[in-house]
Amino acid sequence: MEFKVGQDVSEIWNIHGSILPEVLMYMFPRSDESYDWEFVNDNGRHIFTAWRKSEPIPTLEEIEKAAIELEEKKNAPKPKTLEERVADLEKQVAYLTSKVEGTN
C-alpha cells in the first residue's frame, strides 16, 4: 500500500510499539526529522504533510517491516557492561576454585 503526502496516518501512527516518526528515523538514520518529513496533528488526526528526501516515500509494508525490526531491537537484551562480565567471571572462578579445593 502506498504512503502519500496529505494522507491521514492516524491508523498507523502507533505501529509495533513505536510512533511513525521513530520508525522513519530508524529507516533513514541520517535524516533530519525536523526537515525531511512533516506531520501535522489536526484535531487528533495525524496528517502526513511533507516528504523532502531524495529517496522515494516508503510503502506501508516497508514501514511495517521496519517497525517490527525496531521493536525487536528495542526488546533485545542489552549487552552486559564490562563490570557485569567481570563479576560473572569472578563468580565462575570462585565456583571452580571451590570445586578444585573440594577434590583435594
Curated annotation (Swiss-Prot):
The keyword rRNA-binding does not apply. Keywords: Cytoplasm, Stress response. It is found in: Cytoplasm. Induction: In response to low temperature and salt stress. SUPFAM superfamilies: XkdW-like. GO terms for cellular component: cytoplasm. InterPro entries: Phage_SP-beta_YorD, XkdW-like_sf. Its main location: cytoplasm. It holds the Pfam family XkdW. This is SPbeta prophage-derived stress response protein SCP1. The lineage of its organism: Bacteria, Bacillati, Bacillota, Bacilli, Bacillales. The gene is yorD.
